């Protein structure tokens, strides 16, 4: 190994320590046909990073359980926390090509461009949150590639990999689609692996350039927290029809509607349709009570309730949508959210968890986030519960006087 390569390895290690100090999450993607050198390059990088703050993630062809979740779900779940580095051996690009080549969920998508749009918005949201996404595409000449394959065949410990090579996306289809991605996206760095040490040097030089850019960008940023609501609103929530149902009618209806909800739950399961119910509203508006009545007749094996409070330390080290993406339902199941991602433009804004720039772009990000799931057939129903100030005060006083409800009172 040359002295120059050792120098580059040390520099990348130093820069990665600085990105960790600054809380910059790094995602390094390696794509390329089988036996192109992806394993050698990705492992070379992995071994020169701090093992405590780095992770290696290999994308395999989707199995039946994977298909019960949203297309990008596993990548949301495994996002690096701020300051850490993820290495992706094959990535969401290979995942997309698996779907397209094998016509996975063809009846649902019709046009697989919808998944390309999901990838674009996924990356855009992450980049806006200072995630650095570094993409490598590895090329190799046929002679060198055949040499790699022969070495793999000759080793009893790795012979199984050759069979795996034959089970991946056909080489021509993969290359054609990847070249389309590369031609449209300047973030891709193409590396020829024909000469090993030269390939390592090119990888490290590109990493150094991108890490230095990421560090400079974050060091120059200023965080401005301003959660004040300055807009005036010409409409009122109370202009809506708030007609009440009398108690007798309610008691007759609730039993019938709860039974109907149970039937809908089983119909959703049979048709593999995921359902998300989102409840937002003022304090004491009745979110918990509404959720209780919805679930009274449901089969508890098919739903979960997620009570959302202030983000934890671990959640603050991830993209703000990460904690919600992890809880989205698989096919046929129901997830109920008592407060939700809309907190980004509500309580997180007011309490200072989000800077002005972050909450201002959140509305578009939330729309794209929801679309990722509705594109796949997920039903998302959102309810906002409101009440006037007099009724709210009355309920607060009732809580103060009820020992079983005093825990609900907060500052």
Where are these regions (language model features)?
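Glycine-rich phosphate-binding loop of ATP-dependent small-molecule kinases
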Residues: 1-411
